[in-house]
Amino acid sequence: MGRGIAFQLTNILRDLGEDLDSDRCYLPLAEFRAMELTPEMVRAWSEPDRCAEFIRAQCERARAHYDRSAPLDAMIDATCLPTLWAMTEIYKGVLAKIEADPQLAVRGRARLSTLRKVWIALRAKHALAKAENPK
C-alpha cells in the first residue's frame, strides 16, 4: 500500500498547479493551514519560503512511503519486479525534480526526459529477460 501512496502523492505534486487552476486540491487543507498557507497562496507562490517548505514537506512524505515500501520488492514475482522497478524509478525521478525545484509543482509539470525513460525501460527489459530465462 505504501508504494501506491507514494505514487499517488507524486502524481498530486506533479499536477498540483493544474489541479489548483481547476479548483481541485488533493492535499489535506490541514497541512496547508499548519504552515499558514492556503492552496491559493501556494498556487500564486506568494510566500516563496513557506511555499517551498510546504512542497518539500510533501516530497518528504512521499519519499517516506517509498522507503517504507521497499520490502514490497521481495514479495513480487521476479517476472513482475522489472515493471515495478521501472515505475518506481520514473516516479522517484519526477519527485526528485520537484524536490530540487519546489516551485515546479505549480509552475509546470515535472517529467523525465524521453532519454531517461528509455534508459529505465531498457534496464527493466533486460532485467525481465534475465528473470524469464535464469541461468
Label the predicted regions:
Residues 1-7, 13, 17-135:
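Catalytic cores of Mg2+-dependent Asp-rich isoprenoid enzymes
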